[in-house]
Amino acid sequence: MTTITLIRGALTNWREYLVLCKPRIVSLIVFTAIVGMFLSVPDLAPWRVFLFGTLGIGLGAASAAAINHLIDEKADAVMNRTQGRPLPTGKLSREQALAFAITLGLSSMIILYFLVNPLTAWLTLASMIGYGIIYTAFLKPATPQNIVLGGASGAMPPVLGWAAVTGELHVHAFLLFLIIFVWTPPHFWALALARREEYSRTKYPMLPVTHGVDFTKQQIVLYTFLLFAVSLLPFVSHMSGLLYLVGAIGLGGRFVYLTIVLYRNTSNELAMKTFGYSIVYLAALFAFLLVDHYLPKFL
């Protein structure tokens, strides 16, 4: 496939290519990376690093998402939630999706390596491989703990953002990593619980299918309590202040409450409500981190 053909296809089917990028997920990824950038310095992150770092990390995340679509095509075709995606419907071919994923990935590496720094480029590449290939192709079909074992790649964005600005790794960046890492299982298992009948038709051994509803709910509650504790670490380590602490307690308390309600009253509606709140929770928690970091400077 020539470059001209790819460009023409992208212009014609741009909505389908956008779906391949999983824009909602990538938006959250990019936001947490941006928070990592700004928390890494006392003042504002340099505009050049902010611009190209955000672009490069976003393109890398979109590339991994497109690879995920490629590998998940057969499973997507039998699930109501994903049957309308570009590959199962034939709106895009596998060749188009692969060329798109490669183009995004190469663009990400070039931007990050030459316009940001090599460390961020290599870490982003590792994250792309971790999510797009290791998790999707190997862990996801192999074990019910796939989301736990593969969660590291999805938790990397704040580390990438931090490295983009400072050119180094820092323990505070890994506190942000740990929050997302522990957040991922209850977030995903709430969705899997609501869609357990659909997942039972795929090759993937999702926890509600292999271990049952009650065990899955128990794990969701346990991980959410663990997340509540982990979310306090930025305050305990003096990385963040009282404003963040109040936000973390309020947001975490609501998350714990929803999971307990779900544990006592199983329903797909409650599972989806918990899943939806988990997204709001993570975005709001990182917003509190950002506001807490800068608000004292304006008071």
UniProtKB/Swiss-Prot annotation:
Gene3D superfamilies named in the record: UbiA prenyltransferase
Q: Which UniProt keywords apply?
A: Cell inner membrane, Cell membrane, Heme biosynthesis, Membrane, Transferase, Transmembrane, Transmembrane helix
Share an example GO biological-process annotation for this protein.
heme O biosynthetic process
Major localisation: membrane
Which cellular compartments is it found in? Cell inner membrane
MF-aspect GO terms: protoheme IX farnesyltransferase activity
- Per the record, what are the reactions this protein catalyses? heme b + (2E,6E)-farnesyl diphosphate + H2O = Fe(II)-heme o + diphosphate
InterPro entries annotated for this entry? Protohaem_IX_farnesylTrfase (IPR006369), UbiA_prenyltransferase (IPR000537), UbiA_sf (IPR044878)
Q: What is its EC number?
A: 2.5.1.141
| TM regions (residue ranges) | 25-45, 51-71, 97-117, 119-139, 147-167, 173-193, 225-245, 275-295
Q: Which GO terms describe its cellular component?
A: plasma membrane
Q: How does it sit in the membrane?
A: Multi-pass membrane protein
Its pathway, per UniProt, is: Porphyrin-containing compound metabolism; heme O biosynthesis; heme O from protoheme: step 1/1
Q: Name the HAMAP family on file.
A: CyoE_CtaB
Q: Quote the function comment for this protein.
A: Converts heme B (protoheme IX) to heme O by substitution of the vinyl group on carbon 2 of heme B porphyrin ring with a hydroxyethyl farnesyl side group.
Q: What else is known?
A: Carbon 2 of the heme B porphyrin ring is defined according to the Fischer nomenclature.
Q: Which family does it belong to?
A: Belongs to the UbiA prenyltransferase family. Protoheme IX farnesyltransferase subfamily.
The name on file for this protein is Protoheme IX farnesyltransferase
Organism, per UniProt?
Nitrosococcus oceani (strain ATCC 19707 / BCRC 17464 / JCM 30415 / NCIMB 11848 / C-107)
